[in-house]
Structure formats: structure tokens, C-alpha cells
Amino acid sequence: MPPPEKPLGEPLDAPLDENELWLLSFYRTSEISGSLFFGKLARTLRPGPIQIDMTKHFADEAQHAWYWTECIRELGAQPMKLADAYQDQYASTAGMPANLMEVLAITQIFERRVINQYTRHAKAPGLKLPVARTLEKIMQDELWHIDWVKKALESLEPEYGRATIEETIERFRAADREVYARTMREHEERLRTLFGE
């Protein structure tokens, strides 16, 4: 059986440097954190479409953590143990979501950030083949995450009002910009090296 068509990337035997290992471990930690959060939430939701989609979302996040684990191992390393995930900073910046609508609003913003980051990473010079494959696999799910959350927020408009939902999304968008800027400053050297900036 011939090997699958290869996306752009370096040969499989290129080792991970410390910055690459950190970033892939950061992604993995974020996916684990998302899975745990959505899993707990899915257990508490009333039966219905949001509960079903939240359960699928939780399962996807767990699978993504596994994909990053496999990718790191394929590149001859072990995932780093990192204390915090990206989304852990949201609570201190924007406060804890107070209801399901706020959870979905912050999820919409976060998932868009993930897609943007993964798209940026997919264009990085010297992208390793296992990383390219992993990004490609995960981004398909991430697009669905954005779609289902958007539809779920629309379904909540009669309860919360479109204006309130839009204001909430904007509040979390501002918090995300702050968290992203802080993360970029904190890890600027690592990221500049990785993305050739």
C-alpha cells in the first residue's frame, strides 16, 4: 500500500528543538484543559442539541490532545508538563462565565483564536510533516466547533437577546486580545524563532 500523499513539511526524522516541543506541548495542554472543561459541562446540561454537540466537542478536544501526544512522540520526544493552558488566563481577564450563553460566547472567541493560530503555524517555514498532518486533522474539527457554537448562540437569542449576546462576545473578544498579547509578550522569543519573524 503506497504511503498517503504528503503535505508540505520536513522529513520525519527532523528532531524537535526546545521551542517546537514547548509549543506542541502548549497546544496539547490547551486541548486537555478544553476537554476537561467541556466534559464537566456536558455532564450538567439538560438533554437537547447543545448537550449533544457539547459532548462531541469534549470528545474532539480529548482526541486533539492525543493527536498532539502522538505527534510529539513521532518526532522523538515526550510532551512537556506545562502548568497553565492558554484559556486558563481568561478567568482572570474577563471573569468566569456566568451562564451557558457566556460559556458559548467565550468558546466561540477561543475557537477562532485556535483556528488562527493553527493556520499561522501551518504556514511556518520548516514545518515538520507530523506537525502539518496533525494541524490539518485538528482544523477540520475546529471549523465544526465554530459552526455548532455559532448556531447554539443563535438558538439562545430568544432567551438572552441578540444585543446581549453580541455585547458578551465583544467583551470576551477584548479579553482574548489581552490574553493573546500577554502570551505573545511572555513567549515572544520562542514564537519569533518558530515562525521566522
Where do the PLM segments sit?
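Non-heme di-metal
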Residues: 1-197
